[in-house]
């Protein structure tokens, strides 16, 4: 029994916990830019600042500087470079504070209401003796405001990006260009839960954690363009060779029972090291691209292209994927017999396209390699073997591919003040890269293995309508309307039509279907035996 609860209920003095763990957020952005040029050189320099105060008592602050220069050396040569440097600090605050704030009863006090502690936070609103003088109480949950005060989760980020290019044009119709784009990214996250936090209530005093990540990547593109007009005909041909590589290093450390409340800066003094880790990964990819664009009088348009990508994530026999595409378009408004509609019909174009795209982003760089765990030792006579394979590998992994057919219509009226598009598409994805559940008896402690497991079909409709309502020197008012409808359906799993219930995948259903049992009433023992004997009856999923 709590006399305080009686008073709160009689006076309708309820605590608005969601209001206490949230606030009004705001954001500010500032950018200063300086540009200039001479006869053959142009340059630009910019400085930016961003500051956000989040609704959940989180915050984000970012500084960045940009600089670029382009130079025409002579009639054949040109070169340029750009750089973007930034640093940011993200303060995530206490996740437990927000979650528990929305769970707390409005009958619980956030602050002492009188006495010498009036105005101070109540550490445990569900157990405090001032509220429950006879003992007991509904919960030992920590006051979310106290949790927030003693919790920190900060991430500092440093990022540097550059782009350097050299261009050579031996004749007017040919452009040769090579571009190097390196990028360096460093992240350091520090987490600290001191006294009077949820972590401490879970037996972890002065919990500190650091996570570090360094990543360096570069893309090197070399391309050749050929552009030529032959009367009413225009040809634009492109050939490109691209190299991409990324190296990432990471480390982590978790400690508890630090003697000082100094965030994560004195982890060497901690009594317990709960976890330590480090890691390295490398990803490489080579790409070839060929593309041909053709148009006749800007009326009939044709594009044919193909790219070949080789990824280090796959074994040599499955490393390369070929992804062709083609598209045709007809600008009906460019036909001579449409000249009478020019005053009200600005654009009318039909489009038809086909293309194949590839995806390898779902898997890590070493999913085709057998991984070992060093926690266990095996004695083979006089030889002690350290480690065992703990994750099953799949050497047959290959690219996930999506084949898409698209039919579209673009339209514009009244000098394109009203314009939009309609698209109908079908996307068939096959060799999906997904994890499959496996019995532990197969030798995997993870209970899963990556595979190219099935086929999924997406069909949909997309509509877009844009209008320019007012356009003047001092005022512009535009509106946009977008509608999209997509239907997703699993066609095949693991080469057949068998459901994979362990993963929640069912033939004919969406890949992320929400499913459950449909109650059909009480089943007697006799009915259960009859149903079990009839193998043709299956459980229905909705």
Task: Please give the residue ranges for each predicted region.
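Core alpha/beta catalytic barrel or barrel-like domain that forms the active/cofactor pocket
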Residues: 92, 109, 196-199, 303
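Acidic, Ser/Thr-rich peripheral helices and adjacent loops at domain boundaries
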Residues: 99-103
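Residues embedded in well-ordered regular secondary structure
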Residues: 1-56, 94-97, 112-153, 166-169, ...
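Intrinsically disordered, low-complexity segments enriched in polar/charged residues with Gly/Pro
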Residues: 19-21, 198, 279, 383-384
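Extracellular/periplasmic, surface-exposed regions of secreted and cell-surface proteins
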Residues: 28, 61-63, 67-77, 82-87, ...
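Flexible, solvent-exposed loop segments that connect beta-strands
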Residues: 9-10, 199-203
């Amino acid at each position: 029994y709590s006399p305080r609860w009686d008073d709160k209920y009689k006076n309708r003095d309820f605590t608005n916990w969601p209001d206490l763990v949230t606030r009004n957020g705001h954001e500010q952005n500032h950018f200063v830019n300086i540009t200039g040029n001479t006869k053959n050189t142009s340059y630009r320099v910019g400085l930016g600042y961003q500051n956000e105060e989040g609704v959940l008592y989180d915050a984000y602050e970012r500084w960045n500087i940009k600089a670029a220069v382009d130079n025409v050396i002579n009639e054949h040569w040109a070169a340029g470079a750009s750089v973007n440097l930034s640093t940011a600090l993200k303060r995530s605050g206490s996740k437990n504070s927000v979650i528990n704030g929305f769970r707390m009863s409005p009958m619980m006090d956030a602050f002492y209401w009188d006495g010498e502690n009036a105005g101070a936070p109540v550490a445990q609103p569900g157990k405090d003796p001032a509220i429950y003088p006879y003992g007991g109480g509904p919960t030992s949950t920590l006051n979310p405001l106290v949790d927030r005060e003693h919790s920190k989760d900060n991430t500092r980020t440093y990022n540097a990006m550059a782009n350097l290019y050299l261009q050579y044009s031996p004749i007017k119709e040919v452009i040769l260009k090579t571009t190097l784009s390196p990028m360096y990214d460093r992240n350091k996250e520090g987490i600290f839960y001191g006294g009077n936090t949820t972590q401490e209530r879970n037996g972890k005093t002065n919990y500190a954690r650091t996570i570090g990540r360094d990543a360096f990547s570069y893309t090197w593109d070399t391309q050749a363009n050929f552009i030529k007009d032959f009367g009413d005909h225009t040809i634009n041909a492109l050939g490109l060779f691209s190299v991409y590589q990324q190296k990432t290093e990471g480390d982590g450390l978790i400690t508890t029972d630090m003697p000082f409340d100094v965030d994560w800066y004195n982890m060497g003094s901690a009594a317990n090291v709960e976890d330590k880790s480090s890691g390295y990964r490398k990803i490489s990819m080579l790409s070839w691209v060929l593309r041909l664009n053709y148009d006749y009088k800007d009326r009939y348009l044709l594009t044919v292209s193909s790219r070949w990508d080789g990824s280090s994530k796959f074994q040599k026999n499955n490393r390369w994927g070929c992804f062709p595409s083609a598209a045709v378009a007809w600008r009906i408004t460019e036909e001579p017999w449409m000249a009478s509609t020019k005053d009200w019909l600005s654009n009318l174009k039909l489009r038809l396209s086909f293309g194949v795209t590839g995806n390898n982003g779902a898997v890590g760089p070493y999913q085709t390699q057998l991984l070992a765990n060093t926690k266990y030792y095996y004695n083979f006579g006089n030889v002690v073997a350290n480690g065992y394979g703990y994750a099953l590998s799949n050497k047959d992994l290959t690219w996930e591919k999506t084949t898409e057919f698209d039919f579209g219509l673009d339209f514009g009226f009244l000098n394109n003040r009203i314009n939009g598009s309609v698209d109908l598409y079908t996307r068939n994805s096959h060799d999906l890269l997904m994890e499959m559940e496996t019995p532990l008896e197969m030798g995997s402690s993870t209970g899963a293995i990556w595979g190219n497991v099935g086929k999924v079909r997406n069909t949909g409709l997309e509509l877009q309508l844009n209008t320019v309502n007012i356009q003047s020197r001092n005022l512009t008012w535009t509106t946009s309307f977008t509608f999209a409808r997509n239907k997703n359906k699993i066609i095949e799993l693991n080469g057949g039509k068998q459901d994979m219930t362990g993963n929640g995948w069912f033939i004919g259903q969406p890949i992320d279907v929400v499913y459950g049992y449909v109650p059909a009433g009480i089943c007697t023992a006799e009915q259960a035996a009859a149903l079990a004997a009839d193998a043709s009856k299956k459980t229905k999923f909705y």
